Amino acid sequence: MSSTTPSDKDRVVIFDTTLRDGEQCPGATMTFEEKLNIAAMLDGMGVDVIEAGFPIASDGDFEAVNEIAKRTQNAVVCGLSRAGAKDIDRCAEAIRPAKRGRIHTFLSTSPVHMKYKLQMEPQAVFELVVSSVTRARNHTDDVEWSSEDGTRTEFDFLCRCVEAAIKAGATTINIPDTVGYAVPEEYYDLFKRVRETVPNSDKAVFSVHCHNDLGMAVANSMAGIRAGARQIECTINGIGERAGNAALEEVVMAMRVRNDKLPFWNKIDTTQLTHASKVVSAATSFPVQYNKAIVGRNAFAHESGIHQDGMLKNAQTYEIMLPETVGVKQTSLVMGKHSGRHAFIHKLEEMGHKLAGNQVEDAFVRFKALADRKKHIYDEDIEALIDEGMVSAHDRIKLLSLSVIAGTRGPQRATMKLDVDGVTKIEESEGNGPVDAVFNCIKSLVPHEAKLELYQVHAVTEGTDAQAEVSVRLSQDGRSMTARAADPDTLVASAKAYLGALNKLVMKRQRDVAQGAAAAAAS
């Protein structure tokens, strides 16, 4: 159980929902392997509860939750469930292998949701709250109940549902700001009043879950904690539906840096925050904005002359936390073609990467190839290199070579060689620009109906020899996959990113077909 006790009344449970709410962000779909990798990382950095997915949503979600439940050593593994019996039973089956499992069941309670979404009367909703929590409690003694759209729910009805949920066996009560509508003072008052009004409120841990539609997710989360909540639901980088969720790195560091005003503690190893941000960014192919608090590239950068002067005299003049506390290495060490395997492995360990022997060897080979083309290799280059290796290990379609003829006189022409399931294929195509020519080559070599939804380029580091990092999102048949790739040649990076997204679509389709066949055979 992850509930608080009188001896640790100021401890805040960190409930990470990157793999569930975070993945619901359009285009943020992760592969099975990426989910396992992120879950292991979250467990290792001290997250208390990992919401691993929504088991009833798909066979893929069920499989991921089930496997994470088997592998997780320390954290509670949680699955999300609607209030129906089928949902709850499926969720219970998914988390069954966990050392500590939790069922998180939810039901809308606001007038607008009950009328238009559920099309149910309040009394029927109330009865379903009781029956759903009771059913979940029959499977596990760790049950969380959420009042969806809690901040727009009528107060008396909310209190009635909360009291009934606790009486039915809920050990955690979550009152989410589902649509990001609340302001801090309002959210504080809501938690304070609910806890004072509900007679059995001391029998459960209260939880906050805030969305960022008005940019107040972190502020609202802190307000809820000050009012007595002791669990924060959040995501790495703040990813999530619409404008996202409260960012884990921000709520954790707010408690650490301003402990004088927020006298609470948590178990997160903050030195892993920057690495975690990069891992999730790579898996979702969502770049972290440069000025993102805590983990953005500019979070500890100072360009103003006045600021730089102050920093040189005393870092405390313009920095409220040490970069090292969030895992930012303050070093000017760069690597190049003369760097050996030992130095490379040391650098990987310093950056928080734990790779198997064959993965290290593969990464080192690609590092040396990059070093032959680029004078200085920075940490950002190595991060991009590792990211590419992690997602390309099982690719069915691989880029072997690419040459492009471009200039002021068109048309532009690309010649590409691919390995498709072990078969080498070559094609030459023209296009309205070099990128179009490259993508037309891929379409000729691997015919598909996927639609290009996103094409984005930015430089990994500074300088004319900087690697270009390209993000590509493809969608087909209701599936949407995003991939990133980096290379000193923008066109090569573009081809790799497109192929990365295409490989993800192929793998997703294969997994769905296999699961469908297995389900049909079992029925």
Swiss-Prot record:
SMART domains associated with the record: LeuA_dimer
Q: Which residues does the annotation say bind Mn(2+)?
A: D21, H209, H211, N245
Extract the GO molecular function terms from the UniProt entry: 2-isopropylmalate synthase activity; acetyl-CoA C-acetyltransferase activity; manganese ion binding
**Which intervals hold domain Pyruvate carboxyltransferase?**
12-274
Q: Quick one: a GO cellular component term?
A: cytosol
Q: What class of enzyme is it?
A: transferase
Residues passing through the membrane, by range: none
Query: Entry's Pfam families?
Result: HCS_D2 (PF22617), HMGL-like (PF00682), LeuA_dimer (PF08502)
Q: Which segments carry the region annotation Regulatory domain?
A: 398-523
Cofactor requirement? Mn(2+)
Q: Which GO terms describe its biological process?
A: L-leucine biosynthetic process
**EC number(s) of the enzyme?**
2.3.3.13
Q: In which pathway does it act?
A: Amino-acid biosynthesis; L-leucine biosynthesis; L-leucine from 3-methyl-2-oxobutanoate: step 1/4
Q: What keywords is this UniProt entry annotated with?
A: Amino-acid biosynthesis, Branched-chain amino acid biosynthesis, Cytoplasm, Leucine biosynthesis, Manganese, Metal-binding, Transferase
Domain of life of the source: Bacteria
Reactions the enzyme catalyzes: 3-methyl-2-oxobutanoate + acetyl-CoA + H2O = (2S)-2-isopropylmalate + CoA + H(+)
Any idea where this protein resides? Cytoplasm
Family annotation (NCBIfam families): leuA_bact, PRK00915.1-3, PRK00915.1-4
What does this protein do, in the record's words? Catalyzes the condensation of the acetyl group of acetyl-CoA with 3-methyl-2-oxobutanoate (2-ketoisovalerate) to form 3-carboxy-3-hydroxy-4-methylpentanoate (2-isopropylmalate).
**Family stated for the protein in its record:** Belongs to the alpha-IPM synthase/homocitrate synthase family. LeuA type 1 subfamily.
- What does the annotation say about its assembly with partners? Homodimer.
Concerning HAMAP family, the annotation shows:
LeuA_type1
- The molecule here is called 2-isopropylmalate synthase
Organism from which the protein derives = Bradyrhizobium sp. (strain BTAi1 / ATCC BAA-1182)
Upper lineage is: Bacteria, Pseudomonadati, Pseudomonadota, Alphaproteobacteria, Hyphomicrobiales
Gene giving rise to this polypeptide: leuA
